[in-house]
Every structure is written in C-alpha cells, then in structure tokens.
C-alpha cells in the first residue's frame, strides 16, 4: 500500500514541496533566507492579527489605541514591538535573499525572479502603510510626503493623490483605507509566495556553483528541514534580543509625538529599510525625475536577467564580478546612510554620486565585466 503522504491529494502537495523534494547537496546558508522570510510573514500576520483586535483606525483614537495596547493589553507591548521589529527583520532577510539571487545568478529563473520582485514591491507597500497606522508625527508626515510624490505624474497626478487621500489632505479617510489595505496585503503576499514556490519547484533550486545539480540531489527532509529550523531559531533569537533589549533602536522617537498637521518635523525620513531608495529620490532635483529614479531603483532588478552576459551563471568563479557586487553592496550602504542625513553639503553630492554608481554598476559595469571575463577565459 502506498504511503499516505504520497497518495493523499493534500498531503501529497506538502510532501512534494517539503519532504521528498530533491534539493542540491551543496546549497549553503544563503539558501536559508527563503524559509526565514516565510517565518517572518507568519510572525507578522499573527502579531498583526492580535494588534488589529485592539487597534482603532480613527485619527482621534489611533495613537491612543496603540498606547493602550502597550500599557493595558496582556503582552501588548510584546506584540507591538515584535510586529515593528519583525518588519525590520523581514527586510534584512529580503535584501539578503535578493543579494543571494544576484550573486549566484538565481535570476536566470525569470518567472521565480519576477514574482519575487512583485513580492518585494508588495512588502514595501505593506510596510509603508503599516508605518502610517500609529498616527505619530513620522506616520503623518511620511504619509503626506510619500503619497504627494504621485502628484509628479503629469496631468492626473493631483487628482490621483486626492483620490488616494480621500480628501484634500491626509486625514481620517486616509488612515481608514491604509489600515484596510495593510490588513489585506499580507494575505495577498502569502498567496503570491505560493506562486513564487510553484515556479521555483518547476526548475528546482540553484546552487553556489551555478552548475546544474541533477545528478547530485538529496531529499529536502531531513537535511534541509533541520538546517531551516536552525535558521529559524537563530533569527527568532536575534529578533527577541532586539525586541526585549532595545525595541526602539530602529524606530524614530518622533513617532511617540501624536500627529500634528500644523507642526512639520525638521527631518522627514522613512524607516531605515527605505533610506537607500529615499536617497536616490532626493539625489535628483526634479520631482518627476526623482520619482522615476525611485521606482526604477527596484524595477531595474526585472531587467537583470536580460543584462546577464556571462557564460557562467554564478559569481563563485568570477573574481572581477565579485568585486563589483561588493562595490554595489557598499554603495547601497552608503545610500542608506545618506538617506538619513539632512539635505546639505556634502551629503547632497555623495548621494548623487552613489545614485549614479548604483545604476552604472547594474546597467553598464556588470555586463561589461562579464564580457571581459568571458574573453579572459577564451569563451
């Protein structure tokens, strides 16, 4: 008789994805971040669900409801800080996951890669909407500034912004709809994760060498289940250390001041995980140009598979491309730093140079270096 896990219609799906799935024998810890992102999403949905039970999406009571959660709800402080810092953990894992894909050439699985980029956009949209909900100063002014960027769209811009706001400024209608979308999007993300995995399992995983591993596969369980569980423990330990020892380390003290439309904070900046894109936005002195650069800074990942000129898939055996990759990482860290600084000399010019370098590396230097490596290897 066939084992139930191989014959039952539902259990069979789980079996093919988590138990009997053939996986390359040499995938490193960089392949752990996919499962870690799944854990992050689960943590965010669970903590968010319990927070939503006590939160009120009304401008008059939103700030006080968050205070009430922290002070009066059993372990409400823990839920709130797990959710806030869980978002930071989510983005750390996301950026490492995308970085792994770039380094090892996983983007050659174009369907998986493109669904992943749509997921990245969806997570960014969700995080932005979530940041507005506590209705502090940074929430209100962040929502005002970022939604206002859409007014740069020619002809329909102003109407579009007022349509999103539900009025002539960020107000009660805006907060209510942002809460609705912030609640809805994670479930759409969860569905898209399934599509992401569906496309991945069509091709199988890549591996550090970039060479097909059809002849050297091992079952996912127990080898990679135990490896993933170790990753879960390490990540959750890091998250709990952050939440229990310094919960406000990555936040902004201005958000403990209730939203006041009559008082603009001296420096309006997003959470740390958006600073690199914010720096690119600010580096162009034209509003529409800045918005286009902001969108393209993420959208550019979509054309990375087209720009792949190397005869090798992975960067493992390509030292010149490796140097460029780490230059790109350093450049993104520089942009993150610049995004948090005021708009004054020398930060303006550093931001502009870092932005030019970012697009140059991806569009020009990487493809040319790959061609040069092909030539050096006489390919």
Curated annotation (Swiss-Prot):
UniProt KW Heme keyword: yes
Residues annotated for heme b b566 binding in this entry: 97, 196
Protein family membership: Belongs to the cytochrome b family.
SUPFAM superfamilies from the UniProt entry: a domain/subunit of cytochrome bc1 complex (Ubiquinol-cytochrome c reductase) (SSF81648), Transmembrane di-heme cytochromes (SSF81342)
Topology term for the membrane: Multi-pass membrane protein
Location in the cell: Mitochondrion inner membrane
Keyword set includes Electron transport: yes
Reported cofactor(s): heme b
Binding-site list for heme b b562: 83, 182
Protein name: Cytochrome b
Ranges that cross the membrane: 33-53, 77-98, 113-133, 178-198, 226-246, 288-308, 320-340, 347-367
Keywords recorded for this protein, A-Z: Electron transport, Heme, Iron, Membrane, Metal-binding, Mitochondrion, Mitochondrion inner membrane, Respiratory chain, Transmembrane, Transmembrane helix, Transport, Ubiquinone
Any Pfam family: Cytochrom_B_C
Effect noted on mutating residue 129 to M: In strain: Isolate Durban5
Protein's GO biological process: mitochondrial electron transport, ubiquinol to cytochrome c
Gene transcribed to yield this protein: MT-CYB
Gene Ontology cellular-component terms listed: mitochondrial inner membrane; respiratory chain complex III
GO molecular function: metal ion binding; ubiquinol-cytochrome-c reductase activity
């Amino acid at each position: 008789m066939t084992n139930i896990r191989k014959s039952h219609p539902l259990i069979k799906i789980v079996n093919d994805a988590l138990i009997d799935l053939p996986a390359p024998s040499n995938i490193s810890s960089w392949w752990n971040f996919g499962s870690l992102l799944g854990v992050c999403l689960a943590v965010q949905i669970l903590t968010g669900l319990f927070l939503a039970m006590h939160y009120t999406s009304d401008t008059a009571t939103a700030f006080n409801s968050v205070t009430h959660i922290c002070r009066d709800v059993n372990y409400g402080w823990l839920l709130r800080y797990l959710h806030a810092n869980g978002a930071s953990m989510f983005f750390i894992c996301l950026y490492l996951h995308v970085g792994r894909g770039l380094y090892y050439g996983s983007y050659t699985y174009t369907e998986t890669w493109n669904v992943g980029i749509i997921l990245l956009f969806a997570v960014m949209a969700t995080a932005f909407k979530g940041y507005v909900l506590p209705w502090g100063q940074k929430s209100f002014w962040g929502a005002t500034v970022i939604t206002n960027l859409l007014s740069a769209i020619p002809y329909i811009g102003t109407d579009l912004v007022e349509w999103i706001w539900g009025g002539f400024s960020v107000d009660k209608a805006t907060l209510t709809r942002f809460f609705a979308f912030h609640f809805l999007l994670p479930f759409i993300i969860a569905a898209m994760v399934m599509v992401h995995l569906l496309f991945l399992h069509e091709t199988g995983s890549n591996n550090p060498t970039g060479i097909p591993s059809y002849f050297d596969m091992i079952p996912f369980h127990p080898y990679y289940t135990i490896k993933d569980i170790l990753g879960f423990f390490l990540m959750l330990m890091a998250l709990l250390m952050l939440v229990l020892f310094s919960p406000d380390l990555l936040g902004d003290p201005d958000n403990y001041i209730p939203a006041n439309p009559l008082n603009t904070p001296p420096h309006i900046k997003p959470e740390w995980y958006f600073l690199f894109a914010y720096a690119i936005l600010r580096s162009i002195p034209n509003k529409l140009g800045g918005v286009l650069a902001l969108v393209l800074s993420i959208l550019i990942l979509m054309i990375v598979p087209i720009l792949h000129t190397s005869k090798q898939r992975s960067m493992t055996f390509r030292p010149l491309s490796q140097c460029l990759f780490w230059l790109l990482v350093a450049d993104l860290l520089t942009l993150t730093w610049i995004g948090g600084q005021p708009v004054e000399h020398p930060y303006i010019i550093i931001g502009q140079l870092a932005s030019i370098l970012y697009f140059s590396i991806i569009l020009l230097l990487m493809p040319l270096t790959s061609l040069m490596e092909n030539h050096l290897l006489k390919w």
